[in-house]
Amino acid sequence: MYICFACCMIVAAQRPSYGQKYLLMTNVCAFIITVGDALEFFAKTQEAALVATKMAYVGKMHIMLFALLFVTGFTQVGMNKKIAWALELYNTILLAAVMTCENHSLFYASISYKLLPGGRYILELEKGILFYAWAAEMLVGICGYCFIALKGGVLKGSKESKLRGTLIFMAALLPIVLLLIYMAGFFPDFDPTTLATTIMSVCFLVAIKRYGLLDAVQLAQERVLEDTKDGLIIVDDKQDKILYLNPVAMTL
């Protein structure tokens, strides 16, 4: 929770830009998720735990959309506004189902309270059809995010740019592994969402502080080198080694 909050503060302190805006929204969603999960962990009644779960879903329903808007903007792929609004509408419908889940069995087929051996109570939530609809959206969204980050970040640009792209890629890859493990039922009493969002925030923090993820001047300089129509090769004359080739130089 504190790591996600720190990431929100660091992103908010960066120079305003398209990437900064959507990365901030992504990390605000991550912070909401971790706060909701923490409140559920310490809840003493079923009603309090259910309210905390609903709070966490406010972040869960929006984090993927904001992450996609960030990565498409960062890699200059671009995202169709109609697709973004369609995803927002879809997530709003699912969020409405979560907020009223005790009145129907669409998102959760059943809701009960379970006492663990350690004396802590947890919610037992049997997954409904809309839960799987949300999980499918998350998996497709994360795969799309990873593909865009891999193509536009990891495999493109200078060494530092590739390291930055790798961190952006890992910010989604590790959470999807945890989500798949959870969906497979290996740890039914352990919700990996908080761990996944924390890993994501750590990756973004390192990318920002170490590799200038939101440094507008540095990113602009790199894109000038990459987008120029002339071939550019930077060589270390002491070690007789090529340090950088822009895309045009690679085709020569």
Over which residues does each language-model region extend?
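PAS/LOV sensory domain surfaces, especially short acidic/polar patches at coil-to-helix junctions
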Residues: 239-251
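Sensory-domain cores of signal-transduction modules, predominantly PAS/LOV
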Residues: 230-233, 241
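Individual alpha-helical transmembrane segments in multi-pass integral membrane proteins
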Residues: 1-4, 15-106, 130-140, 191-200
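Alpha-helical transmembrane segments
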Residues: 6-10, 146-149, 205-211
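Interfacial "cap-and-anchor" motif at the non-cytosolic start of specific transmembrane alpha-helices
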Residues: 25, 152, 158-226, 233-235
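Alpha-helical transmembrane segments of multipass membrane proteins
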Residues: 8-9, 35-38, 70, 176-180, ...
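Juxtamembrane membrane-water interface segments that cap and precede transmembrane helices
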Residues: 113-130
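Alpha-helical transmembrane segments of multi-pass integral membrane proteins
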Residues: 12-36, 53-55, 125-183
